Amino acid sequence: MMQFHFQFYVGPVFTLRPSKGFLSTCLVSFLFVTTTFCSYAIADLNSDRQALLAFAASVPHLRRLNWNSTNHICKSWVGVTCTSDGTSVHALRLPGIGLLGPIPPNTLGKLESLRILSLRSNLLSGNLPPDIHSLPSLDYIYLQHNNFSGEVPSFVSRQLNILDLSFNSFTGKIPATFQNLKQLTGLSLQNNKLSGPVPNLDTVSLRRLNLSNNHLNGSIPSALGGFPSSSFSGNTLLCGLPLQPCATSSPPPSLTPHISTPPLPPFPHKEGSKRKLHVSTIIPIAAGGAALLLLITVIILCCCIKKKDKREDSIVKVKTLTEKAKQEFGSGVQEPEKNKLVFFNGCSYNFDLEDLLRASAEVLGKGSYGTAYKAVLEESTTVVVKRLKEVAAGKREFEQQMEIISRVGNHPSVVPLRAYYYSKDEKLMVCDYYPAGNLSSLLHGNRGSEKTPLDWDSRVKITLSAAKGIAHLHAAGGPKFSHGNIKSSNVIMKQESDACISDFGLTPLMAVPIAPMRGAGYRAPEVMETRKHTHKSDVYSFGVLILEMLTGKSPVQSPSRDDMVDLPRWVQSVVREEWTSEVFDIELMRFQNIEEEMVQMLQIAMACVAQVPEVRPTMDDVVRMIEEIRVSDSETTRPSSDDNSKPKDSNVQV
């Protein structure tokens, strides 16, 4: 251990000055600690890389993995997710890729920071290596639909939240050590070969439990009696709530004392009437017996039907958002076409269509081309699923357009397309999910004194990001490729002041609208007439978007139901009459020294919404002009604090 010695000299001057040797020692120590930390971080990631490469080399797989030493493990390896600091692997998701055989030891068990392990729907077999169930940080384990065997291991991770080992060949008893998993909320062990009693899990925070279709026996612990009967069905030797009550070992003794009764006197009859009595009695008894048997059969059938209906009702009651999602954006999926979700190269997602249909769904919004859903899959993966409506294109044309959208979407300011699905009745698109919302919600949502307004700097940065994204689409897609649906709700916030565009390139797939709406909204005048979108019509729509950002008003204003005025016309009328600050968003009035920049941005917008398409600038020109505003801003020092002063009146030539 390194020790530091200080010497104090008592004298007329009480000053403590560290020696040069001490400072040098501190500096060396600091560099040593920093270097050691970085070395450990690099070593951890290299160790994880070698462990995964060893796993891929030892376990055959039908689907090709892009794992190699040249690709960056955290950025491009399929199914691999790293920690936020990029020092180790924290999630491995490889469902349904055809993994075959046992998991070798000293491979996945060396991923010491692993939190999520999903190898479901493969052909894996054998026992789970001890080093896997000894991983200390596992939160979610999905190993269902494989052929694992042996006893269910005792997982040591105290933070284990979900454990799914269903549809395997595990044998033996359910470990009593599961009581120690205080954070466990979901346990799925159905369709195995487990035997023995059900352990008491009263110390566990279970919300979902399924032990059905095993060989369990004994009484169900009272702490688990609140789960539905479907959680325990298929275990014939299991009893207790919610199943049938457990029978006692021997019948209880009768409380009624035994009283001997004398035999009944013989029924008097004549010898000659013996045959007549026999015939007259047999026929009614036979008829009555048949009627009784028929009645019993009917009662049994009614009970079975009622029990089946009751079971189906209970199943309906426990349906989650999963089934709701399947009905919403999976209602048109055809059974023969399941699992035909098409992923694009470079996509790190690894799930199939059935996983997507099982995901919980939340409606994000309904737009011109369909409804967008936030889908949360079971491995904590969140994506956006766009369910398209009124698609007129055939399968080949649809697939070709998806390829183009994926190719041109490779830009920081564009939301990338990750996968798609096509069938006769259902068309789906899968994109990344960004939790920060969109520009429309920032501008118009929850306006008032309690809302933090979107400041001017953020508005300019967001506008510039969107402009760069559209300019990239025009350059990468060629002269015939346009966005076609530019609006504030399609400007998605990646993080603060950083945005990207979505919902582009879908116009060629859609049926031609029957008639335009009364208000123009974001659409250029020529689009209202020809129904054709071009680069210039995108420029017009982007000009409307800038006006929306400047004014804080929606692009279609309705002073009254009978009088609808589009935003460009309203701004032009205000400017032509006499320029006032009323055209700008009132929430911008608190910021100082931004009048000149707002006027410059307004001039850009008015150039974009020119009636004649040829007069409008290109998107590259728009990007350049906005960047010039940013340059002038950096050269001018102005306070960023709030101020109640209003911008001065300015003159704008339109």
Curated annotation (Swiss-Prot):
Residues covered by the Protein kinase domain: 358-631
Record key words, sorted: ATP-binding, Leucine-rich repeat, Membrane, Nucleotide-binding, Phosphoprotein, Receptor, Repeat, Signal, Transmembrane, Transmembrane helix
Entry's Gene Ontology molecular function annotations: ATP binding; protein kinase activity
Keyword Signal found: yes
Subcellular location field: Membrane
LRR repeat feature ranges: 113-135, 137-158, 159-182, 183-204, 205-228
Record has Repeat as a keyword: yes
GO CC annotation, single: plasma membrane
Top-level taxon in the UniProt lineage: Eukaryota
Modified residues (Phosphoserine): S360, S441
Coiled-coil annotated spans: none
UniProt remark on domains: The protein kinase domain is predicted to be catalytically inactive.
Protein name, per record: Probable inactive receptor kinase At5g58300
UniProt organism field: Arabidopsis thaliana
